[in-house]
Regions:
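Conserved nucleotide-binding/hydrolysis modules and their immediate coupling elements
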Residues: 307, 520-546, 550-556, 565
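Catalytic cores of soluble metabolic enzymes centered on carboxylation/carboxyl-transfer
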Residues: 259, 298-533, 651-664
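Long, charged amphipathic helices and adjacent flexible linkers at domain junctions
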Residues: 323-331, 446, 450, 574-599
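Structured functional modules or segments
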Residues: 587-666
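Structured, non-catalytic alpha/beta "coupling" segments that mediate domain-domain communication
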Residues: 77, 87-94, 336, 346, ...
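N-terminal beta-alpha lobe that positions the nucleotide/phosphoryl donor
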Residues: 1-274, 278-297
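Short amphipathic alpha-helical segments
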Residues: 3, 166-167, 243, 384-390, ...
């Protein structure tokens, strides 16, 4: 076994590998960019080496720097995690050339599976079922369109070197093909350095089922059963589970044996995942093989009781697989939800910012949290916006779903927008709860998953007011203690006014709605008036930002996180955001809107889709912004004239930067 390994990655997967390595007595070396100098994986590792600037292409993707870090620290092997260089055959070969072990498959296997078109040919020869499609080398747009027309729409255009949902476009009709092809090629070139694409028939209501395989250097290969990853947004997984609901033993064996055949066809070693598209009639087709550990590997660990990172380390050290196929068994059901900094109501737009509060549910036999961040850390635009993976396990799917619902309700994040509320709706969705799964579930269930924005409920508003009053009292006491006259009445925050009732107003904004709560101070409580009715309230600070609240005869526990004027209320599993409004600083914003469209996040302009001076209709695409390795099309908010672009192709833009000068039609 190794004495020291280097982890060529960051975030939660680096922390995950460190955890197992530490248990096995293996020392770890972290690598980091300037943006990650204080990251959790750097703090957890025994040693850490700076690679370079924040941009991945100048740090985490520079193989020579990683090899040099190995030499400087004496690391014997490199665990690539997932993403970055994990599926780069040149990196694997470079490590071997420098006497270092790549904790992953042979370079030849990565190369064989790295090209989707080549992989399809190999799988066909190994009798692994294939989807109808075009996997040829001729990339002439006219030929590709002809092939798509012959396959029949809908078709899926996929980057041949792709993965992770990037470089994929669904095309419903021939007229849209060339635009989708151009966009797909741009994204493929940006993400993978290769614009080669393939085309496949798109199966209506498919399920995405993948098989975890493992092979050693002694010729043994097993499958550790399946994961259902059908719930996706933008072709990226959101919620995964194992085993797949409704999977029969016969079908599980058939898919598992097909996955093992796929692995053996390329001389595979280590952890790999063979992904299949499964039809509603029970047929299944090879999609791709990911030659690395998957993000969702924890659900497999939970149902098998195996540590897959330990398996990786043992196999890379030349040891045999820990178990044979007949020794592996499924126990219970596991679910994994990916907690992202993103706004589900804005097309899952990635978010950035500081994790002012980060309180995951407590871990136990049933609940696991894999994360690479802690409270106070920043989610930056440079890397994937994942905050954590929330994994639950129980004896059956219904019990696991109940665990997930509670764990999501207990998850508290403040400082930026997350998808936690969306995930809560997803696990409560009747279609998901009933295992009516396919990759279009989120789109099919839009009405349930994306309800109209509701106003912050009355209880949350009253709790916010109580939290504000308690905080004011706390500040007043602190000021009194620190003053030369602690008994001065001027320190009191009790609403006292000469010759008037002790009362005041607290003002908040819920979106664009202004909310005034009248506070009447009583001897040991407040009378809070809102919307024509009055509630008697008491409050008592607990630990941190938690406090106990009494609203008439009801007792609640809540938290209030305040950053500048932003207030985040955590109450009974819900998260509510308000702005503290100061009447003395109100301005009329009615005419403050400029004539430009702003960047929803930091990114790079990759295409301009209109001409200055051109009249456009509402929804017309104006430009494409690339952020976090995804393309985002900026469209006209209304009919009008594009006056000018503020940036050229290739230029970086900041969050909120004006992108175009636009004049709306009257």
């Amino acid at each position: 076994m190794f004495n020291k390994i280097l982890i060529a990655n960051r975030g939660e997967i680096a922390c995950r590998v460190i955890k197992t390595a530490r248990r096995l007595g293996i020392r770890t070396v972290a690598v980091y960019s300037e943006a990650d100098a204080n990251a959790r994986h750097v703090r957890l590792a025994d040693e850490a080496v700076l690679l370079g600037p924040a941009a991945a292409r100048e740090s985490y993707l520079v193989a020579d720097k990683i090899i040099e870090a190995c030499k400087r620290t004496g690391a014997q092997a490199v665990h690539p995690g997932y993403g970055f260089l994990s599926e780069n055959e040149d990196f694997a070969e470079a490590l071997a050339a420098n006497g270092l072990v790549f904790i992953g498959p042979p370079a030849a296997a990565i190369r064989a599976m790295g090209s989707k078109s080549e992989a399809k040919k190999l799988m066909g020869a190994a009798n692994v079922p294939l989807t109808p499609g075009y996997h040829g080398d001729d990339q002439t747009p006219a030929l590709l369109q002809q092939e798509a027309d012959e396959i029949g729409y809908p078709v899926l255009i996929k980057a041949a070197a792709g993965g992770g949902g990037k470089g994929m476009r669904l095309v419903e009709r021939s007229a849209d093909f060339l635009d989708a092809l151009a966009s797909c090629k741009r994204e493929a070139l940006s993400s993978f350095g290769d614009e080669h694409v393939l085309i496949e028939k798109y199966i209506t209501r498919p399920r995405h089922i993948e098989i975890q395989v493992f092979a050693d250097t002694l010729g043994h290969c097993v499958y550790l059963f399946e994961r259902d990853c059908s719930v996706q947004r933008r072709h990226q997984k959101v919620l995964e589970e194992a085993p797949a609901p409704g999977m029969s033993e016969a079908r599980r064996r058939e898919m598992g044996e097909a996955a093992v055949a796929a692995a053996k066809a390329v001389g595979y070693v280590g952890a790999g995942t063979v992904e299949f598209i499964a039809n509603q009639d029970g047929s299944f087709y090879f999609m791709e093989m990911n030659t690395r550990l998957q993000v969702e590997h924890p659900v497999t660990e939970m149902i098998t009781g195996q540590d897959l990172v330990e398996w990786q380390l043992r196999v890379a050290a030349g040891q045999p697989l820990p178990l044979k196929q007949e020794q592996l068994e499924i126990r219970g059901h596991a679910l994994e939800a990916r907690i992202y900094a993103e706004d589900a109501n804005k097309g899952f737009l990635p978010a950035t910012g500081s994790l002012i509060r980060l309180q995951p549910p407590g871990e136990s036999l049933h609940v696991r949290v894999d994360t690479g961040v802690e409270a106070g850390d920043e989610i930056t635009p440079y890397y994937d916006p994942m905050i954590a993976k929330l994994i639950v396990w129980d004896e059956n799917r219904d019990a696991a779903l109940a665990r997930m619902r509670q764990a999501l309700a207990d998850y508290q994040v403040a400082g930026l927008t997350t998808n936690i509320d969306f995930l809560s709706r997803l696990v409560a969705c009747p279609a998901f709860a009933g295992a009516d799964l396919d990759t279009g579930l989120i789109e099919r269930q839009r009405d349930f998953l994306f309800p109209a924005v509701q106003p912050v409920p009355r209880d949350a508003l009253l709790v916010a007011a109580v939290g504000e009053l308690l905080w004011e009292q706390h500040e007043a006491r602190q000021a009194a203690r620190n003053s030369g006259d602690p008994w001065s009445p001027w320190h009191a925050r009790d609403g006292w006014r000469m010759n008037l009732a002790a009362a005041r107003s607290l003002s908040f904004k819920d979106g664009d709605t202004l909310i005034d709560i009248r506070v009447d101070y009583r001897a040991d409580q407040w009378a809070l008036s809102l919307g024509g009715s009055t509630t008697l309230a008491r409050g008592r600070k607990l630990d941190g930002d938690r406090f106990a609240v009494e609203l008439d005869d009801r007792r609640l526990i809540a938290s209030l996180v305040a950053v500048a004027e932003r207030r985040t209320v955590f109450l009974q599993g819900g998260t509510y955001t308000l702005l503290r409004d100061d009447p003395l600083h109100r301005v009329d914003a009615g005419d403050s809107q400029g004539g430009g469209l702003t960047a929803p996040m930091p990114g790079k302009v990759v295409a301009l889709l209109a001409q200055p001076g051109q009249r456009v209709e509402k929804g017309a695409p104006l430009l494409i912004l690339e952020a976090m390795k995804m393309e985002h099309t900026i469209t006209a908010p209304t009919a009008g004239t594009l006056q000018a672009f503020c940036f050229a192709v290739g230029e970086q833009v900041g969050d909120g930067a004006a992108l175009v000068e636009f004049v709306a039609e009257a």
